[in-house]
Amino acid sequence: MNSKKLCCICVLFSLLAGCASESSIDEKKKKAQVTQSNINKNTPQQLTDKDLFGNETTLAVSEEDIQAALDGDEFRVPLNSPVILVQSGNRAPETIMQEEMRKYYTVSTFSGIPDRQKPLTCNKNKDKNENEDVASAENMNWMQALRFVAAKGHQKAIIVYQDMLQTGKYDSALKSTVWSDYKNDKLTDAISLRYLVRFTLVDVATGEWATWSPVNYEYKVLPPLPDKNEASTTDMTEQQIMQLKQKTYKAMVKDLVNRYQ
């Protein structure tokens, strides 16, 4: 084989290989990632603790840090203050929640679906300082960006709530109710409903935050009325869920106002 043919073969292999050579295992991983990505696209992304609190939940905390946090001033959100309201996993908070909040505050809304960063590619800028890139990635988080948006709009606070509707069924063996996430399942009168919510309140100026979960309500699903078709039964279920949410939102907002006005 002469040198020209050998050179052509080498060039061909390098083009096929791209920026990195991949084994059959790499191909399987890629396919799995694509499959997982397609699944995730169908499920709204929820805000995580890292989105809300940055790296605070994973940092090494000293006793001095705790005492300094205790000595910090408590922040307040006076009535009629301009605030940003966010519901995790939704483009906008539910209308009934917005209406309840507007009784006490001037409300603007923001999307609760985080924009995830694109994965790194092999086309890397070698001239860039890698340490600076790592530091920037560690310091940037969703809440920090939203605080900047709120500051530009002269908002006083950011209120984020994460919610979860669950169904429960009594287990005679365990002698307790077993709860699981509601997935549009058909409900019977043996099922209970509960609506779990966690609030995170962030002061725009200081970044100080507080988080808590109000006491939740539990509803027993009402049995369908006799001689009612499936559509009527579905409407009745939706009404019960809406009533549960409305009652929960009303109590939650009242609790928020009492704590921070």
Curated annotation (Swiss-Prot):
Lipidated residues (S-diacylglycerol cysteine): C19
Signal peptide: 1-18
Record's subcellular location: Cell membrane
Main location, first listed in the record: membrane
Residue ranges that the Swiss-Prot or TrEMBL entry lists as coiled coil: none
Membrane topology: Lipid-anchor
Lipid linkage positions (N-palmitoyl cysteine): C19
Any single Gene Ontology cellular-component annotation: plasma membrane
UniProtKB keywords: Cell membrane, Lipoprotein, Membrane, Palmitate, Signal
Protein name: Uncharacterized lipoprotein YafT
Organism encoding this protein: Escherichia coli (strain K12)
Gene that this polypeptide is encoded by: yafT
